[in-house]
From Swiss-Prot:
<feature type="transmembrane region" description="Helical; Name=5">
    <location>
        <begin position="186"/>
        <end position="206"/>
    </location>
</feature>
<keyword id="KW-1015">Disulfide bond</keyword>
<feature type="transmembrane region" description="Helical; Name=6">
    <location>
        <begin position="237"/>
        <end position="257"/>
    </location>
</feature>
<dbReference type="InterPro" id="IPR003912">
    <property type="entry name" value="Protea_act_rcpt"/>
</dbReference>
<keyword id="KW-0472">Membrane</keyword>
<keyword id="KW-1003">Cell membrane</keyword>
<feature type="transmembrane region" description="Helical; Name=2">
    <location>
        <begin position="57"/>
        <end position="77"/>
    </location>
</feature>
<feature type="transmembrane region" description="Helical; Name=4">
    <location>
        <begin position="138"/>
        <end position="158"/>
    </location>
</feature>
<dbReference type="InterPro" id="IPR000276">
    <property type="entry name" value="GPCR_Rhodpsn"/>
</dbReference>
<keyword id="KW-1133">Transmembrane helix</keyword>
<feature type="transmembrane region" description="Helical; Name=7">
    <location>
        <begin position="272"/>
        <end position="294"/>
    </location>
</feature>
<feature type="transmembrane region" description="Helical; Name=1">
    <location>
        <begin position="27"/>
        <end position="47"/>
    </location>
</feature>
<feature type="topological domain" description="Cytoplasmic">
    <location>
        <begin position="48"/>
        <end position="56"/>
    </location>
</feature>
<dbReference type="GO" id="GO:0015057">
    <property type="term" value="F:thrombin-activated receptor activity"/>
</dbReference>
<feature type="transmembrane region" description="Helical; Name=3">
    <location>
        <begin position="98"/>
        <end position="118"/>
    </location>
</feature>
<feature type="topological domain" description="Cytoplasmic">
    <location>
        <begin position="295"/>
        <end position="357"/>
    </location>
</feature>
<dbReference type="GO" id="GO:0007596">
    <property type="term" value="P:blood coagulation"/>
</dbReference>
Length: 357
């Protein structure tokens, strides 16, 4: 962070010349791109063309997969930038676009995983009481609102020239040196950073943890209804999502908060550590397909058909239990409502054939 007319401090100059960062980031981004691009293309293919009907969870997973692929489009620019020792040659407009997409991916992934956890919680703990909220149009609306909110939150990055010419090194940086004028005053900087940390990370993390604890507790209490296989898949899903939060997202967000506190109040810097934690935040692109694997029974079945075709697919007792449960639910809805309500209940319960787990 630099003010008009001031020179970069020694710590920032040292960070821009740090060989560990210039080597580590391109290597990690390349590996993530190699793994995540085919994985997310396969996921998108399965989710869009092989899973019907499109339940709320599927809508959220499609949103997550598209977000991951958009981030993959940013990797070539980031890789070239760091190979060139933090020298940006693509202009200020592309710098802003790549930066916004890079950070939108992380926070969109966080919010989408939170939406999936809420949808799972409603489907397991309150399957009938909250069924009207588990509809496709609400999931689509949530995705649209999510992206509008993110674009508004990152408006300072969208409307500011994020490039900076470092005359001492003869390079032009992209986002590595922020201009103080990006926001009007000190209070605006504090509000911006707290929004990123509290609203886009801390609150979603707490909600996600609470939803999965409630979901797993309910599954354990009603294991005879859902079956051990579905309970196990739900537990695996919870473990993977929480691991992504703790491993991929938490280090970056906590280091960012600590760095900005040190920068704003003590004129120090934790930016090298922050840059390295960006590698961790990108790893979620490789992990997301595993979330789909455990979140959707149909995705799991398609995966097995493609990669393990000789293994017979059989849901046996688990499928019969789920079908029996869906049938009971449908009957109750039909008998307790009017004619149109009964038809709506049948339609909704048919959607339950796509596993709520």
């Amino acid at each position: 962070m630099v003010k008009n007319g001031s020179h970069l401090d020694a710590e920032t100059l040292a960070m821009l010349q740090n060989k560990a960062i210039s080597i580590t980031l391109p290597v990690v981004y390349t590996m993530v791109a190699i793994i995540s691009i085919p994985g997310n293309f396969f996921s998108l293919w399965v989710l869009c063309w092989h899973i019907k009907p499109k339940t709320p969870s599927v809508i959220f997973m499609i949103n997550l997969s598209i977000t991951d692929l958009l981030l993959a489009c940013c990797f070539p620019f980031q890789i070239f930038y760091h190979i060139q020792r933090n020298h940006w040659i693509f202009g200020k407009t592309l710098c802003s676009l790549v930066t916004v997409m890079f950070y939108s991916n992380m926070y969109s992934s966080i919010l989408t995983m939170t939406c999936i956890s809420i949808e799972r919680y409603m489907g397991v703990v309150y399957p009938m009481k909250l069924i009207k909220w588990r509809r496709k149009r609400y999931a689509l609306g949530a995705c649209v609102i999510m992206w509008i909110f993110l674009l508004l939150a990152f408006y300072p990055l969208e409307s500011t020239d994020l490039t900076y010419e470092v005359k001492e090194l003869g390079i032009i940086t992209c986002f590595d040196v922020l201009k103080w004028e990006m926001l009007p005053n000190f209070a605006a900087w504090v509000a911006f950073l707290l929004t990123l940390f509290v609203v886009l990370f801390l609150i979603p993390f707490i909600v996600t943890v609470g939803c999965y604890i409630g979901t797993i507790r309910k599954l354990i209490q009603t294991s005879s209804r859902y079956g051990n296989k579905q309970k196990t898949r739900s537990i695996y899903l919870a473990i993977i999502v929480l691991s992504v939060f703790i491993t991929c997202f938490a280090p970056n967000n906590f280091i960012l908060l600590a760095h900005m506190i040190v920068r704003l109040f003590y004129e120090g810097s934790l930016y090298p550590a922050y840059k390295l934690t960006l590698c961790l935040s990108c790893l979620n692109n490789c992990i997301d397909p595993f979330i789909y694997y455990f979140a959707s029974k149909e995705f799991y079945q398609k995966f097995m058909q493609v990669f393990r075709p000789k293994v017979p697919l059989s849901d046996s007792l688990e499928t019969r239990r789920e079908s029996l449960f869906s049938g009971r639910t449908m009957s109750v809805r039909s008998m307790s409502s009017g004619p149109m309500d009964g038809l709506e209940g049948v339609k909704i319960c048919l959607q339950r054939q796509e596993s709520v787990f």
